[in-house]
Amino acid sequence: MSLPRCTLLWARLPAGRGAGPRAAPCSALRALVGSFPGASGRVPCLAASSSASGGSKAPNTSLFVPLTVKPQGPSADGDVGAELTRPLDKNEVKKILDKFYKRQEIQKLSADYGLDARLFHQAFISFRNYIMQSHSLDVDIHIVLNDICFSAAHVDDLFPFFLRHAKQIFPVLECKDDLRKISDLRIPPNWYPEARARQRKIIFHSGPTNSGKTYHAIQRYLSATSGVYCGPLKLLAHEIFEKSNAAGVPCDLVTGEERLTVEPEGKQATHVSCTVEMCNVATPYEVAVIDEIQMIRDPARGWAWTRALLGLCAEEVHLCGESAAINLVSELLYTTGEEVEVQKYERLTPISVLDHALESLDNLQPGDCIVCFSKNDIYSVSRQIEIRGLESAVIYGSLPPGTKLAQARKFNDPNDPCKILVATDAIGMGLNLSIRRIIFYSLIKPSINEKGEKELEPITTSQALQIAGRAGRFSSHFKEGQVTTMHRDDLALLKDILNRPVDPIQAAGLHPTAEQIEMFAYHLPETTLSNLIDIFVDFAQVDGQYFVCNMDDFKFSAELIQHIPLSLRVRYVFCTAPINKKQPFVCSSLLQFARQYSRNEPLTFAWLRRYIKWPLLPPKNIKDLMDLEAVHDVFDLYLWLSYRFIDMFPDSSLVRSLQKELDAIIQEGVHNITKLIKISESRKLLNLESLPSGDQSRLSGASKSPARRTRGTKSAGNKATEPLSPSDKELPLASRLVQQGLLTADMLRQLQKEWLTQQPEHSREKVGTRRKKKDPDSD
């Protein structure tokens, strides 16, 4: 090697290398980590410094996803380390690395720097692959490995390089303290300086359902010079919006999917009715009303009530809800220096639990409401009621708001023959219903536990009281409410549940903001959004009065669109869009919307019509009805995004008009729901699932897209006269008659019985013989 070349290479080495091959790595190790365990003057480790500064729990390292560090390829300057020393023997290097891995001292030192057994193993595997697969190594590590080969250095001298590599694949190790500060959620009141700048008057209106607590708060809201109403549902926000304007108080409406202004030229009204997530904590009001404050404990949405409670900038804040929330609210507002005035209310009409169960649908009376906790029970009960010659209205959670209101009006109308309501717990709030008797079809409700697992548990006292309280409301035709169960065995349990005291609410929900997630991403730029959320929740520090809300739905959306190239802020907004992850079509629509956005292609009205295969026909069966509900949710998703990205979702008004048309189609389907149930039962009777896929799609409307199942332009009334395609003509006569709506399952059974009874005895024996021979083949 020439002298100039040697001088150049030597100059590139880090300062301190001139002390010799043995001294250099040792000094590097001391400079980075200090003396080894047992020696004085050891550098404090990350874990120790974190503990000292915050006293926080150790992080869940299973959430740390290692990044990939690619081995170094050939260098333009050649292998400088080999030129200064010699080429490394890969077999010798592998032995050195294996010895390094097995050293107990190294494992202990790694643990001090936050590398538990799992992280240490993953970091070592990556470190070894990097060393073994690189064409040329950095000069310093090459020299250390060479020195170890010649016993001129100790294997422990590799630790600084190993730690540097570990921090490359686990960047969270480098910034633990910063991440803990960002995710410190222990003083939420400080997030709202505008609210803290004034002394608010807090009035808690406490009472059971139908006690008038919300009425008194709304009266104060209407008399104020400015006000905001924060409700849990779009239906409630709409109701206050209409009441306020009807009372001559100009009021705007703000929900996730809708904005309505009443003043000319779009000027903001003095009052606004909104869903609680949409309240503006920067706008000053004279009066604010927060409805259903007990939902501050909700595992998914509780953060919105916490934000409204601590952040609304109003002279008076009126809270309406259960008494179970009084203590927690008082404790939270004690930290802000605000006192809570409690006004308690009693129920306006009496309600009683009957001593007998319904036991049979034959015992139904006008004004009865059967509460089910599954759609299958809704369909089954509705069908049984129809068989008895009675009409029923149907309300469940996934129905569009307009359809729910239409069914409520039908049930409440004294001139309508529909006197029975079949509903889920969706009737617990948001609808004014004239119910005389609540009948619990079951007391078991599916729920999702903290691990995301489905559980079947009896309803809570709070849930039972909320639902039972819908009977005999003050404004209804029935001045006394009654509650019972469908089955005799459930009645004692219902009485026990209703007589239990409601457990006081222990904690309020919190939720990371977009700004906090952005700061996390600044420190962990290569980490996925879903993983960022996991790490944030794990690092988050809250006191006993708060909890971090369940973010599984957010993470589901984040993972769904992870491969789409979007900025972090845009990705965050898409992930906060409210979707039902049980609806595949809605999930695929979110993905498609994000993909279009990433291409900078506006999602126009024409594009959306093509996407959903508009126009859509009335549903032919229950599955079609569910598909139409999914399309309605897709419209909601479009409208929700249109208020966040107006340039990319420009046709909100046209989509809203289309959604109203779809709402009418769904209303027609729900009105005829018992007919849809009949057809669905007929499909099961005929075992249509065993037909060829083409015939099945012809009968059931099945296709790749939910919207396509009801695609077409002919009206439902012309279906019986539609010409049959060649494939239809090959179907059995019974299948074709069911397809055209001319026969139902009950009709087929009756025809079969009549045909058998009219045959001579010897003919029936032959038929029976043929069936017996056929059965083994069918198995």
Swiss-Prot record:
Polar residues bias: start-end ranges: 693-703
Modified residues annotated as Phosphoserine in this record: S725
Catalyzed reactions: ATP + H2O = ADP + phosphate + H(+)
Primary localization: nucleus
One Pfam family per UniProt: Helicase_C
A single GO cellular-component term on record: mitochondrion
Key words, A-Z: Acetylation, ATP-binding, Helicase, Hydrolase, Mitochondrion, Mitochondrion nucleoid, Nucleotide-binding, Nucleus, Phosphoprotein, Transit peptide
Biased composition (Basic and acidic residues): 761-779
Claim: Transport is one of the keywords in the record: no
Cofactor(s) this protein cannot do without: Mg(2+); Mn(2+)
Annotated region described as Disordered, given as residue ranges: 693-732, 754-779
Phenotype upon gene inactivation: Die in utero before midgestation. Show elevated sister chromatid exchange (SCE).
Top enzyme class: hydrolase
CDD domains named among the record's database cross-references: DEXQc_Suv3 (cd17913), SF2_C_suv3 (cd18805)
UniProt: ATP binding residues: G207, P208, T209, N210, S211, G212, K213, T214
Localization: Nucleus; Mitochondrion matrix; Mitochondrion matrix, Mitochondrion nucleoid
FT transit peptide: 1-40
SMART domains for this protein: HELICc
The Helicase C-terminal domain, residue ranges: 353-521
Any single biological process term in GO: mitochondrial mRNA catabolic process
Family to which this protein belongs: Belongs to the helicase family.
Subunit structure: Homodimer; in free form. Component of the mitochondrial degradosome (mtEXO) complex which is a heteropentamer containing 2 copies of SUPV3L1 and 3 copies of PNPT1. As part of mitochondrial degradosome complex, interacts with GRSF1 in a RNA-dependent manner; the interaction enhances the activity of the complex. Interacts with LAMTOR5/HBXIP, WRN and BLM.
Function: Major helicase player in mitochondrial RNA metabolism. Component of the mitochondrial degradosome (mtEXO) complex, that degrades 3' overhang double-stranded RNA with a 3'-to-5' directionality in an ATP-dependent manner. Involved in the degradation of non-coding mitochondrial transcripts (MT-ncRNA) and tRNA-like molecules. ATPase and ATP-dependent multisubstrate helicase, able to unwind double-stranded (ds) DNA and RNA, and RNA/DNA heteroduplexes in the 5'-to-3' direction.
Protein's name according to its UniProt entry: ATP-dependent RNA helicase SUPV3L1, mitochondrial
Lineage: Eukaryota, Metazoa, Chordata, Craniata, Vertebrata
Gene that this sequence comes from: Supv3l1
